[in-house]
């Protein structure tokens, strides 16, 4: 269902210097999505304001029927409805979103919503590891947090 989207995310992650990493979160990442579930994508970018205001990247994923910007604290989301009936929510955050001190919302997303899905298992090419001492290793790419759940507790 989302195979082409994941392929395009990988291309964007590899070719866009402003994007530090891309996370698949929510029901698709957990493998609990049902028909009609949206795809939740977190984009950690050093140029958040450009991505939010330009928005042209959303057209890379299909023909846009409608889009809406939602502000949720440190995350600005662009919710997009595509002609193929897919709905994608792009959550765009600064690198500080995954800072040393996690707020409860960020912690919930990272522990419950970034779990490897069998749909995307073989598409990962980079990773993030947040150690208990607060050191974070962030690499460009799509990342999955299945092995990191215990670290965040």
Task: Identify the function of each model-found stretch.
Residues 1-23:
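Helical scaffold of the NTase/Pol beta-like nucleotidyltransferase catalytic core
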Residues 2, 50, 70-73:
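Generic structural signal for well-ordered secondary structure
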Residues 7-8, 25-28, 73-76:
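Short alpha-helical segments and helix-capping/turn motifs at coil-helix boundaries
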Residues 13-15, 31-35, 79-80:
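Short secondary-structure boundary/capping segments within folded domains
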Residues 18, 35-37, 73:
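Residue-level preference for short coil/turn positions at secondary-structure junctions
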Residues 26-62, 85-91:
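Catalytic metal-binding acidic patch
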Residues 60-153:
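Conserved NTP/Mg2+-binding pocket subregion across the NTase superfamily
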